[in-house]
Swiss-Prot record:
Keyword Transport: yes
Keyword field contains ATP-binding: yes
Keywords assigned by UniProt, alphabetized: Acetylation, Actin-binding, ATP-binding, Calmodulin-binding, Coiled coil, Motor protein, Myosin, Nucleotide-binding, Phosphoprotein, Protein transport, Repeat, Transport
Disease note: Defects in Myo5a are a cause of Dilute-opisthotonus (dop). Dop rats have diluted coat color and are occasionally associated with severe neurological disorders.
Catalytic activity: ATP + H2O = ADP + phosphate + H(+)
Modification Phosphoserine, positions: 600, 1425, 1625
Compositional bias annotation for Basic and acidic residues: 1136-1147
Physiological role: Processive actin-based motor that can move in large steps approximating the 36-nm pseudo-repeat of the actin filament. Can hydrolyze ATP in the presence of actin, which is essential for its function as a motor protein. Involved in melanosome transport. Also mediates the transport of vesicles to the plasma membrane. May also be required for some polarization process involved in dendrite formation.
N-acetylalanine modifications at: 2
Gene: Myo5a
Binding-site positions, ATP: 163-170
Record protein name field: Unconventional myosin-Va
A GO molecular-function descriptor: cytoskeletal motor activity
Amino acid sequence: MAASELYTKFARVWIPDPEEVWKSAELLKDYKPGDKVLLLHLEEGKDLEYRLDPKTSELPHLRNPDILVGENDLTALSYLHEPAVLHNLRVRFIDSKLIYTYCGIVLVAINPYEQLPIYGEDIINAYSGQNMGDMDPHIFAVAEEAYKQMARDERNQSIIVSGESGAGKTVSAKYAMRYFATVSGSASEANVEEKVLASNPIMESIGNAKTTRNDNSSRFGKYIEIGFDKRYRIIGANMRTYLLEKSRVVFQAEEERNYHIFYQLCASAKLPEFKMLRLGNADSFHYTKQGGSPMIEGVDDAKEMAHTRQACTLLGISESYQMGIFRILAGILHLGNVGFASRDSDSCTIPPKHEPLIIFCDLMGVDYEEMCHWLCHRKLATATETYIKPISKLQATNARDALAKHIYAKLFNWIVGHVNQALHSAVKQHSFIGVLDIYGFETFEINSFEQFCINYANEKLQQQFNMHVFKLEQEEYMKEQIPWTLIDFYDNQPCINLIESKLGILDLLDEECKMPKGTDDTWAQKLYNTHLNKCALFEKPRMSNKAFIIKHFADKVEYQCEGFLEKNKDTVFEEQIKVLKSSKFKMLPELFQDDEKAISPTSATSSGRTPLTRVPVKPTKGRPGQTAKEHKKTVGLQFRNSLHLLMETLNATTPHYVRCIKPNDFKFPFTFDEKRAVQQLRACGVLETIRISAAGFPSRWTYQEFFSRYRVLMKQKDVLGDRKQTCQNVLEKLILDKDKYQFGKTKIFFRAGQVAYLEKLRADKLRAACIRIQKTIRGWLLRKRYLCMQRAAITVQRYVRGYQARCYAKFLRRTKAATTIQKYWRMYVVRRKYKIRRAATIVLQSYLRGYLARNRYRKILREHKAVIIQKRVRGWLARTHYKRTMKAIIYLQCCFRRMMAKRELKKLKIEARSVERYKKLHIGMENKIMQLQRKVDEQNKDYKCLMEKLTNLEGVYNSETEKLRNDVERLQLSEEEAKVATGRVLSLQEEIAKLRKDLEQTRSEKKSIEERADKYKQETEQLVSNLKEENTLLKQEKETLNHLMVEQAKEMTETMERKLVEETKQLELDLNDERLRYQNLLNEFSRLEERYDDLKEEMTLMLNVPKPGHKRTDSTHSSNESEYTFSSEFAETEDIAPRTEEPTEKKVPLDMSLFLKLQKRVTELGQEKQLMQDELDRKEEQVLRSKAKGGERPQIRGAELGYESLKRQELESENKKLKNELNELRKALSEKSAPEVNAPGAPAYRVLMEQLTAVSEELDVRKEEVLILRSQLVSQKEAIQPKDDKNTMTDSTILLEDVQKMKDKGEIAQAYIGLKETNRLLESQLQSQKRSHENEAEALRGEIQSLKEENNRQQQLLAQNLQLPPEARIEASLQHEITRLTNENLDLMEQLEKQDKTVRKLKKQLKVFAKKIGELEVGQMENISPGQIIDEPIRPVNIPRKGKDFQGMLEYKREDEQKLVKNLILELKPRGVAVNLISGLPAYILFMCVRHADYLDDDQKVRSLLTSTINSIKKVLKKRGDDFETVSFWLSNTCRFLHCLKQYSGEEGFMKHNTSRQNEHCLTNFDLAEYRQVLSDLAIQIYQQLVRVLENILQPMIVSGMLEHETIQGVSGVKPTGLRKRTSSIADEGTYTLDSILRQLNSFHSVMCQHGMDPELIKQVVKQMFYIVGAITLNNLLLRKDMCSWSKGMQIRYNVSQLEEWLRDKNLMNSGAKETLEPLIQAAQLLQVKKKTDDDAEAICSMCNALTTAQIVKVLNLYTPVNEFEERVSVSFIRTIQVRLRDRKDSPQLLMDAKHIFPVTFPFNPSSLALETIQIPASLGLGFIARV
């Protein structure tokens, strides 16, 4: 069909827009050929008349159907053009948050400016091994494709990463290298992948800088070759760099920085090791402050410096070299601060003692004067003379900057060289993958030499890219055998010729650089003369003579000629370099070793420093003028040569392209600027790829997919059995132009737009069918609805009319009744009102009259009381006046009497003074005295009588007074009562009158009260009835409340049970976590063991050491010994000496055990020697003290002390000797790691045996010496007794004589022997008593401690109980008592069990001993039997016994152990054993052998057998670890062996299910609990290996069977994609289906059942298998946009139901396997539910509790409708989901950990099989073992 036919009404198109680049619009009417205007409707609601170009009449680009928007591959779009590409990228980037998109063979990566969780190890594992087209676009997919193609095609690969600065090139390259490092691993002993990754921080610090476009912009290009060996493991890497931006060292634009390393140095200046560099803030250096932006937000330069140093250390750059690098970098910074002062216009100088220059010279180790001179001067050389010429300040500054740039460039190259040296490998490189991180096409306002080189490189890369794309397109057409014509594509060879051909731009530039007076202007004129108007790609700007324009493949670029020559020459003065070469700093001359001799036009040197000096030059011995003619290569030439080498490398590899796009210039996250994106798409070749694809057949369908999609366009008669012929017939009818499509072998190829046309036909057909279906259904529904409404209306009318008639009759009855009721009611109301008013009036009257009477009474009473008060007051006033008057009279009398008394006193005093008065008075005084005396006596008597009378009278008076007072009070009370009675009488009279009146009123009110009572009675009855009803309701409510309480109690019980279950689950989770950590450690340990073995093998191969056959390596020995060797509790240390005499054919583990025991014995000897030494020291102190007291015994004491010191020295020398011998032994054992070292006869073995013999002999000698020394100490104690000074010499002499006599007679030896025996006996008794006392003391201490703890607990409990209420206190005390009794009961039970075990063990030993005694008795009887001939040998004959009672043991000889292990483990075929014999037979045989060794009490035999068994199982699994049947077999047997060790261990917990006969088979001598733990660890390792095996088998099936295969045919509609799949990296091994997975699961299950694996263990394996299936399926679903659809959700749900059915068939529903599929089930449900409203969001949040928030959002973002009738998930709905899930606490991880292994447990499963019934089949080849 014609293209114009697609421009119909409602068709959507793209029109150009100055702001948005392209804008979408919709046609309002059909387009007809010849129309000049299109009526469009824009998306913002405006109408537009779009005028077509009259010259070309080109129609606007058509927009793709919405179903195609958001495709993974841009070439899958039906319409391939710029607006479609731009829109698709924008939708994926903004709406779906997807930064990667394919464009044919190109991966387009848009920088999100945000950290995304899509680069973790789980994502790497998900992409590993997958086809590139099967997964969503990702840098890991490109890396995986390169890695697989390298392995499949045996061809080197390249990944070319390009883009603008800030587009993310470096990050993409870094992630690609991380992918290779993760999936491949390294082949050498060092982690090469870590070194490759460690090179990134180093290169970023010295080669990256902050620019206005990027905070971490790479200012150089690099190509990293990652080398692989034949096994495709990383062995090394090599890096090439291109065009370092040296000018940044000395100059930075605004808001930019120098290289990161300078700022890292300044940030770390305060470190102690950096003090010598004398650095400071970055703002204090000229080379780091020009940009004005020394800090980067979010970046800590000090931490980055630490990372850089760590990376240097990892790459082998020593600390001294690192400090040398930092020293040179610091010198560059100080060099930038060197300033110049102008002396005149042609010369300059440096200030004296200039500090920056001094620091620079100190750091560089050069002479200050020389450097100062050559910074201000230069040499000019002629043929015979050399001139030293001063330079101006500007020239000196430029020379300083050139020197700084040159030093930095040399340092950069030196570091790159050392990095390459560190990454180099001695192993031969088999292949490599190169990662090219190169600058993209650049165009700025001012473009210079750097942009010219960058764009030149991009021209070369674009040419290579176009050729590769074109080649792939043509190869696809040829493969499908379709006719094709040559695709026209842009060839940029003319532009490359313009740059690099002879007389090209670079050639003219180099030629101009050779000219003595060449300038940028002359070079520009040569360009104009050579290329202007001769080359269509070269232009001259109109307004400039110093610029030129080149038409590159991406855009026109105008270059400014200024600076081209200088940058191309890269000139630096040789004299300055020579000064640096003469440095004392050794590292600095290394940087300039490769410099060419002619750095500047002059090469001679001179020491003169005059402003202009002519110096005669003697000709050198070499060729005259040689150095003057030599020139170094220009920068352009070097760059061109390196670029040619790069292109040769890339052309020899298979390229993979990554184009990085910068979405905006402001680094805003997920913000898309269409203008900038279009510029970069044009520049990076993406649109060229689209154009090449669109020129051919971009859309490709297989015949089956085309038939499935467009079956609706076919009639029944068109459908044939041959799908290919059917598709051809239909296409010929649908598309008349046969050039629009081609039929290939397996695919149909369509031109651009044809798929959209087919989609339009399909949509029209489906729309017409939908309209017809809707029309029919709507008519049927309306007709059905009308009939239903008619029947309903008639029925409603009938019921309504009847209802109206009944209502009218009821109305009449109610009206009549209402009239009668109203009559009686009105009468009743009026009568009631009258009665109420009358009663109220009477009540008011009564109350009013009573009120008036009471007022009158209160008035009279007040008047009466006022009179009484007046009376009392007047009497009181009169009495008061009388008392005051009497008081005044008495006072006057007193005053008068006092005056008279004073007068009389005065008179008496005067009389008393006269003598005559005394005389008169004395006359007759005596008689008077006598008389007066008598009178006094009489008066005293009278006085006494009167006093008695007075006392009596007072008593009488008091009693009378009291009576009178009482009478007065009684009278007063009577008076008051009388008054009250009088008032009461009056009031009673008034009340009587009042009561009479009230009585009358009461009688009148009685009637009304009776009436009210009747009414109240009625109301009460009504109230009672109401109360009864309320009571009934309350009873019902009570019952309801009781029921509610029961339910609440039940609910509380359920809640408590639920909480208990939750806590139990939490504890189980904690236990599983702990198990998982432990098993992960075991897994890591086994992995490290394997790695160690691999490394050791490689080391052996590298060192060419012949590997002896069947000998254990040292590593195996050490690991086995450390893991499995332990000392039995029944082994005794006295067995050491006999074991040393065993044959030398002992195994190495036994030798090592002897060595350990020997070392232990030496330690014991050392301790014993130390005790003896301490005792000797104490005795020596006692001797010294006694010597100080007794000075007359020096000779004897000196001799004794000398003897003791001599013995001590001998002991010390012997101890040193033992230590030396032990060290020699250790050295001999550790000198070599070869296996023969520990073999019998080896030097280490001989040394071991000799030392063992010597130590056993020394042991006896030392014991005797100990006894001798102790006896001497005893004799010394007896000798040192306080004696008299006189007898000292005599006693000592006698003592010496006695000793001499005893020596002569030989009695001393006998005394010594007796004393020694006595001391031994006493010593043993003392030691036993000491031990018993210590044990008793320890027991008492433990009891005291337990009592203290119990006391503390009781005190704490008492303190807690005192704070509780009484009920709780009682309950707490009871609880404590119960707990205490329970604990005591448990302790007693434990003691009882221990005693029972001891009794059983003793009984068994008794039986064994009794049997041995019986056998010995029988042997003795046979030996003494008559007729026996001793000399004649008799051949032994085996006589079988009839009905022998076997004990369930197998006897074997020690030398047959290796044969047993070989036949039973190493060479055993699991299939034959599992099919023909009982399950677990090897485990039973091994245990029966262990039982016999236990029966013999042979510790060594048990240890050797168990160690050999474990090592042999490991060896078998290492050899055949990929065979599921082998791993399953040995997992089953290992578990059975472990269960046997438990079942027959003799422990009570494992003997519950045993028979009495089985209990007799328990082990008697050894406790193998430690070996049970070792076997458990081994079983865990085997289980983990089993999981890895089944994962490797299942993994290729899962994605195909669970996702890709259509189990329900016809449900999934094929999307109209372009089907531009990448070439599969994995060979097509056939399509797996769900049935394949189920068959494999059946195979696994049957094998495990045949091997007799425990049912619980089978459940755990099945659970792990289902987890792997669910995790891998979900991970692929989350990474594949094409799988996220409604129909795919139905397929997944059906597949999961089939897996559940399999679980039901195998009775494994309770294994927990179904729960592991819950995330997958919820993801399938999420694909099927509605996703529009808030209610849908709420339902999704509650439904998807097993999915994380990231997974839910990812699925919603990836959801893609299969056809256009479905709607996409809106962005607002996804945001609603995110808001609702914001508070959910789950992992931010996107993918499930497919490598996760659930912790495994081995529940005890005893066997009912009796050991004595087991027969050994002859097929096992175990004839050398015998049943016992």
